Each structure stands twice: as C-alpha cells, then as structure tokens.
Amino acid sequence: MAIQSKYSNAQVESIIAELLAVLEKHQSPTDLSLMALGNCVTHLLQKKVPAEAREVVAEQFAKALSRSVKS
C-alpha cells in the first residue's frame, strides 16, 4: 500500500529543484553534496524534532533512504 503524503508532489519537487540548483551553482561534487545535505538533516533533527523522538525519526529517515536507493 502506498504511503499518502500530506505534501503535494509539486511542493516536494519545488524544494528538491531549489536544493539541487544551489548544489549545481556551487559545482558541488557528490561527496560534498551528500555531506552538506546530511548536515542539513542533522540540523533539522536537532532543531525541529524533540530530543526524545530524534533517534526514532533518524532511523525512519535512514530506512526510507535505504529503500529509495534499492528501487
């Protein structure tokens, strides 16, 4: 069963396009891009997710990321 998102595809695609445009603007190689994006994820987890939920959210994110590259 597909997971329903509360965000539209247009919202998600717009943010992705902007993030990728910034990385392209800086001619960021893949390893630097992944490092920067990973640091952004860490920042969001630390600033926007309650401490008691961070580990679970991080694990869910990691599992979703792993599944997305297997498909």
From Swiss-Prot:
Upper classification of the organism: Bacteria, Pseudomonadati, Pseudomonadota, Gammaproteobacteria, Alteromonadales
NCBIfam families documented for this protein: PRK13689.1
SUPFAM superfamilies: YejL-like
Family: Belongs to the UPF0352 family.
Domain of life: Bacteria
Name of this protein: UPF0352 protein Spea_1764
Pfam families named among the record's database cross-references: DUF1414
Range of residues in the leader sequence: none
InterPro entries: UPF0352, YejL_sf
